[in-house]
């Protein structure tokens, strides 16, 4: 059994233990590709899977607008109320941090294991919800930058 297979199995198990269906499913999918000798699709997935996933994520967020469940008046409220402005600022900060997290994970993919373990601890002991590696990566990137700044 190759080291890559062991890592994917470990990630899948950690995802299951941490109740992170996304990590577990992604690892299982890659294992399926490995076991069916379809690794030739890895380069395509590496280039396009994140983009495809983000498209589906944005589609799911936009469905309330498309279905008419969010009225134009509600949208305008987000620009003139304090909670709305806080939400806009939070979105800006979160997307920037997610970008930093993605860059960190691309440079240091081995950090994924630590983030999954951290997610498991967060879910098991702190009532957290495992939402994905980008936010954890964003926070890790912030902490790495902070540590470098403090040196």
From Swiss-Prot:
Chief location bin: membrane
Classification via Pfam families: DUF441
Membrane topology: Multi-pass membrane protein
Keyword list, A-Z: Cell membrane, Membrane, Transmembrane, Transmembrane helix
Compartments in which it is found: Cell membrane
Protein family: Belongs to the UPF0756 family.
Name this polypeptide is given: UPF0756 membrane protein Moth_0120
Organism, scientific name: Moorella thermoacetica (strain ATCC 39073 / JCM 9320)
Lineage of source species: Bacteria, Bacillati, Bacillota, Clostridia, Moorellales
